[in-house]
Regions:
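Boundary at the C-terminal end of the N-terminal hydrophobic targeting segment
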Residues: 21-23
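Positively charged n-region of N-terminal signal peptides that target proteins for export
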Residues: 1-7
Length: 648
């Protein structure tokens, strides 16, 4: 059974997540004044405090069969344009079953004239009006672009009134300033396998009012290429190369004609792109937005992106260009909803029961967050869950700037190691526990022995932290591939123990050295940890300096004043050991590396006091400080630099 463009386009749109306008919206505005559904439009203006906004008009795809799908067009990519600072005008047009061509392009022209005639009413800056559409909306958008200034045109015996006289703003211009065509049908004479006309029941036959093959003049009149000249606006054309509805060649023909006239900025081919799915993606949306911004003389911006830690297909939380995070929570019966992300943010409830808020800018990298619903702290079901803060939490990932991004991302051209979970029964506690072990690329076949970094998490976390939140394997893979770090094994134990040193020496090291090909001397061992794990590292390495040649302490230090929850929390027994033999420790520890997340790090004052005492004793150490507080972005960076100092 033949599937129409309309049905496939509708199905494709159903797969896309809806954006929601923020404020200043006008719905079902009658741009002609005749009360017809096909003559309604919606206006969405950004809620950014600006008095006016440049405009982008949206046209839906429906094979010209629908007269009321303007909401679908906005759901497709209207929010992206709104986020980029444009006022968005999503329009209906008459269906092909109620009015034949050129009624649809006349509707588009009338809507644009209405926008210009009412610019001050809606706060629209009509010095720039862009237009975009998908499928049949791509056709109408393209036709609107190539017919700037065209009132009528004759093709053979057919004279076509392109402009029309609809509405009361006939003296306004219907010209557009830039066009993005998403997989629109262009040449109706080559819709069947890029060779010939489709049959007499095709959507294009319906809008023409007869079989395409019998109406070649009208086919030419519908073809945007029939009107191309060097005065047309610039175009961006986007098409998936596996589109089963509108042949990919349609955009090839169109792009070539535009390029020949100097009117094509780019033709984007989406590999394996379908009629909507795959072709619609964050990258192509970004390209569309930046194209319109360039043409409008605006600064290019980066669109809000779903957090990399969202569950599949969840749009929120979204990360804005400046590091702020947008949240949406569907909780219609809740009385109060908050986001706990470094601080509490009250959310605002909409009429649809959806709560929203935008946070302050967050630093790069991973951050825990919670939902607080009527006073109950819970993980967000839209996010992956992580064990932190002594409970299962949610996480949001803030993109790194370009100069750091390569450190923390998977790369196709890098050989990757493996992280394995090993279950074992502790000889110290009798409990069954886990240890996560990273082995570098090539470990399985090299036959070599490797040094080991024993790497500990912080309080409220467990053995999963460095692998999941810390990206240990990615950091080491990239450093090793670049020759900046020696190939090494990394062992990540559960540090929630009454006697960590006993478990490390009795369980951890023997297990790793018996199951893996390791170096078994101090020269082949390093010990490091963050926060609580940093104190465990200090205590263990100072009491057993003969076992480790490299020591790393991240965002940690003994307390300036004794704490009741931790034995020897002020570190006095360990200071005494160091004071007895500073030269010995300086010789034993080839690298004693201390890092801190700046003044905002909760361990900063403790660490500062500890380092001052080290200096008084003559204990040599390296110190690195980076802004970010007591957070995983700081600890990832600590590992990144510490790993480069090991086993050399």
């Amino acid at each position: 059974m033949k599937t129409t463009i309309h049905r496939i386009a509708a199905a494709a749109m159903a797969l896309l997540m809806a954006g929601v306008a923020t404020a200043n919206n006008w719905k079902d505005v009658d741009y002609v004044g005749d009360g017809q559904t096909g003559h309604k439009l919606d206006i969405y203006a950004p809620d950014d405090g600006q008095s006016t906004h440049k405009v982008v008009v949206l046209i839906y795809g429906s094979a010209w069969f629908s007269n009321n799908s303007k909401v679908d067009a906005f759901k497709s990519y209207g929010q992206q344009l709104l986020d980029a600072g444009f006022a968005v005008v999503s329009i209906n047009h008459r269906a092909s079953t109620e009015a034949k061509f050129p009624a649809q392009i006349q509707d588009v022209k009338a809507a644009i004239r209405y926008v210009r005639g009412n610019a001050s009413k809606y706060g629209l800056d009509t010095s720039f009006i862009g237009i975009t559409g998908y499928s049949s909306g791509g056709h109408l958008s393209s036709l609107a672009g190539t017919t700037n200034g065209v009132k009528t045109r004759k093709f053979g015996k057919v004279k076509v009134d392109i402009e029309g006289q609809l509405g009361q703003y006939t003296k306004e211009s219907s010209a557009v300033n830039a066009v993005v065509d998403w997989f629109g049908p262009i040449d109706m004479s080559r819709m069947e396998r890029c060779e010939t006309y489709k049959d007499a029941n095709s959507p294009e036959a319906v809008i023409i009012g007869g079989p395409s093959a019998e109406n070649p003049d009208m086919v030419r009149a519908m073809n945007p290429m029939s009107y191309i000249d060097k005065k047309d606006p610039m175009f961006l054309v986007i098409h998936g190369d596996t589109d089963p509805v509108v042949p990919y060649c349609q955009s090839e023909y169109f792009s070539k004609a535009l390029k020949d006239a100097g009117r094509l900025e780019d033709f984007i081919t989406v590999p394996n792109g379908n009629h909507g799915p795959v072709t619609f993606n964050n990258e192509t949306f970004q390209r569309m937005v930046n194209f319109f911004q360039r043409q409008a003389g605006m600064n290019e911006t980066k669109l809000p992106q779903p957090s990399a830690l969202n569950i599949r297909n969840q749009e929120y939380p979204r990360v804005l260009q400046d590091g702020r995070v947008e949240f949406r929570v569907n909780a219609p019966t809740a009385q109060k909803v908050q986001i706990d992300l470094g601080k509490l943010y009250d959310m605002k409830k909409g009429a649809d029961g959806v709560w929203t808020c935008t946070t302050e800018p967050q630093s790069e990298g991973f951050h825990y967050y919670f939902l607080v619903v009527d006073g109950v702290k819970v993980a967000d079901p839209a996010s992956e869950s992580f064990y932190g803060c002594s409970m299962m939490t949610s996480g949001v990932e803030i993109p790194y700037p370009a100069e750091k991004a390569d450190r923390y991302k998977m790369k196709a051209d890098v050989k990757h190691g493996e992280v394995s979970r090993v279950r074992y029964q502790s000889k110290v506690t009798g409990q069954w526990k886990n240890i996560y072990v990273y082995t570098p690329a090539g470990y399985a076949t090299s036959g070599k022995r490797y040094p080991v970094l024993y790497l500990q998490h912080g309080g409220g976390e467990d053995e999963r932290g460095w692998s999941n939140q810390g990206l240990t394997d990615i950091i080491l893979d990239n450093l090793i591939a670049e020759g900046k770090a020696e190939p090494m094994i990394v062992a990540m134990m559960d540090g929630n123990s009454q006697d960590f040193a006993a478990e490390l020496l009795t369980d951890g090291i023997p297990l790793v050295e018996s199951r893996y090909r390791t170096l078994t001397t101090a020269d082949g061992r390093a010990l490091a940890g963050l926060s609580m794990g940093g104190i465990q590292t200090l205590n263990t390495s100072i009491m057993h300096p003969e076992l480790f040649r490299y020591v790393g302490v991240f965002s940690s230090g003994w307390f300036k004043n004794p704490q009741p929850f931790m034995a020897n929390s002020s570190g006095e027994p360990y200071y005494a050991k160091l004071k007895e033999r500073p030269d010995y420790y300086n010789k034993q520890f080839r690298e004693f590396y201390i890092t801190m997340g700046g003044h905002e790090d909760i361990a900063y004052e403790n660490c500062k006091a500890m380092r001052e005492r080290f200096d008084q004793m003559g204990i040599k150490h390296s110190y690195y400080e980076t802004p970010g507080g007591h957070t995983w972005p700081v600890w990832r960076e600590s590992l990144y630099f510490f790993a480069q100092k090991l086993f050399k």
